[in-house]
């Protein structure tokens, strides 16, 4: 598969998201164990998607309604950590918040690549 293939581009961006979440998790205070566990769970889900995308398969990945709901609920649990979050502001509150902002923008890029590609 050529490097210009949308699937290869998507794999690279998801790898960026996983890495940035890992960096954010590394800078998250040990007292925030629930947040650290949630970040690890999200990394694990993204790694499962990566394993699928790395396969040379015509089979399509489907995230069931339960998986989507679980991910949305996980995102909702982050809201107390980002009280007053403004996506148009410069992320400077702390390292963890800045790294999560990088992960968020990379995830949005992955979403756009997926929407453009014939992967659905």
Task: Give short role names for the model-derived ranges.
Residues 1-120:
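Phosphate/pyrophosphate-binding loop motifs in nucleotide- or prenyl diphosphate-using proteins
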């Amino acid at each position: 598969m050529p490097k210009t293939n949308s699937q290869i581009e998507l794999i690279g961006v998801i790898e960026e998201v996983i890495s940035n979440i890992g960096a954010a998790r590394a800078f998250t205070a040990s007292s925030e164990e629930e947040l650290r566990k949630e970040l690890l769970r999200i990394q694990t889900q993204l790694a499962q998607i990566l394993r699928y995308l790395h396969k040379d398969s015509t089979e399509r990945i489907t995230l069931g309604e339960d998986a989507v709901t679980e991910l949305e609920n996980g995102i909702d649990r982050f809201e107390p950590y980002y009280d007053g979050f403004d996506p148009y502001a410069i992320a400077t509150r702390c390292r963890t918040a800045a790294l999560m902002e990088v992960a968020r923008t990379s995830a949005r890029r992955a979403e756009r690549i997926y929407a453009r590609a014939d992967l659905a």
